Amino acid sequence: MWQRITVVAGTVPPRQSHYTFRYEPMFELLPPLNDHNLPWMDTIHPIVVHFVIAMGLITFVFDCIGIFARKPALFEVSFWNLLFATAAIFVAIIFGQVEAGLANPYGASSDILNLHSTIGWSLAGILSAMSAWRYVIRSKDPKQLPLPFLGAGGLLSALIVVQVTLGNQLIWVYGLHTVKVVEAMRAGLV
């Protein structure tokens, strides 16, 4: 990303450009980084992602209760939870990618962060596909839910739990974006 291009006219050999381009990075437009190595007060990704976690897991819970307790009204609730989880995961990913880029991972945290990012994007695709599938199911008969969809919801829930575990490791084991780790990195200790 570049702020501007400065064109300097000059004499150059024939058949070459008459202009020299100088690129200046746009980093000077960003606010300074704080104690957490972020341009804003604290990490936003974990705040947004908690909505995705809650809505993704409660969707499966409502589907199970709806099927086994024969309460089809819960299918409508789980559909809307799934839809909002799908929208929210993209917001979580955007903030997660920015914050991951500013994290300066070290050691094994780099591999965990890469896996966490990959699974996050995969979850976005899976949630989108499941929302579309659920919309088709709901359009045909809103009071029925096929067991294969319930199985897919169970696998989605398991993947969410794995993703939560990886995110917890990044914060509670490796301390990415915590003040002490950022201070140690800035001092060259990590």
Please place each PLM-identified region on the residue numbering.
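Short, Lys/Arg-enriched N-terminal segments with co-localized hydrophobic residues
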Residues: 5-25
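Polytopic transmembrane helical bundles with strong interfacial aromatic enrichment
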Residues: 19-190
